[in-house]
Swiss-Prot record:
CDD domains in the cross-refs: YEATS_Yaf9_like
Protein's name according to its UniProt entry: Protein AF-9 homolog
Keyword line: Activator, Chromatin regulator, Cytoplasm, DNA damage, DNA repair, Nucleus, Transcription, Transcription regulation
Source organism of this protein record: Candida glabrata (strain ATCC 2001 / BCRC 20586 / JCM 3761 / NBRC 0622 / NRRL Y-65 / CBS 138)
Domain of life assignment: Eukaryota
Length: 221
């Protein structure tokens, strides 16, 4: 990391939205070249803008660390799109490191994503995972699994030079409603808050029921 050439802007924070995750499909009759015979799925791991915009103005590179059974398991993507495609048969945790442009003088961020090849078996799957029906291609079947998460990277007190870079773009603002091109929206966020409130309310009701039962039991003794 080079020494900063500008000062930090105190009491200021700038956030940039990203999505990360993977898509996966079963391999069809025509297998991808060099795919091992035991591999059953074709998958892609990625870091993107939720609106499909370019994020390379603040992200320098993304490093994906795959399972050690893969050749060269540490894969570095230094230009958009920040993604890689592989084949495999099992689910595992992928370590993701996001490095920022030199002007940021920020440390990389480090997190994990659980590679998902199969849909959830519960009746009401989380919003992050869905099955998408598509036309059957030569290499894969028609059912695509998506495990995608939304997050915001917050830069606290950014350096002046980096701040200028950040504000040179609109900031990947989420649309009001979900579209085919953008699954995440402000409406989805509000829906999630509503579900959390409903769940919290249900828990409170259950607690009151059990408290009443306990009180009745103690009185009957």
């Amino acid at each position: 990391m080079a020494p900063p050439t500008s000062k930090r802007i105190k009491t200021l924070s700038v956030s940039r939205a990203v999505i990360y995750g993977n898509t996966a499909k079963k391999i069809g009759e025509n297998r991808p070249p060099n795919a091992p015979s035991e591999h059953t799925h074709l998958w892609t791991i990625f870091v993107r803008s939720p609106t499909g915009d370019d994020i390379s103005y603040f992200i320098k590179k993304v490093v994906f660390k795959l399972h050690e059974t893969y050749p060269n398991p540490v894969r570095t993507i230094e230009a958009p799109p920040f993604e890689l495609t592989e084949t495999g048969w099992g689910e595992f945790d992928i370590n993701i490191k996001i490095y920022f442009v030199e002007e940021s003088n920020e440390k990389f961020i480090n997190f994990y994503h659980r590679l998902r090849l199969h849909p959830y078996v519960n009746v009401n799957p989380p919003m992050s995972t869905e099955v998408k029906k598509e036309e059957t291609g030569n290499a894969t079947t028609s059912d695509e699994i998506s495990s995608i998460f939304y997050d915001e990277i917050v830069f606290n007190e950014p350096y002046e030079d980096f701040f200028k870079i950040l504000v040179s773009k609109p900031g990947n603002l989420l649309p009001s409603n979900k579209t085919e091109d953008c699954l995440f929206s402000r409406q989805l966020e509000q829906d999630e808050l509503t579900r959390i409130k409903m769940a919290s309310s249900n828990v409170d009701k259950e607690i009151e029921i059990y408290k009443k039962k306990l009180e009745d039991t103690l009185k009957s003794r």
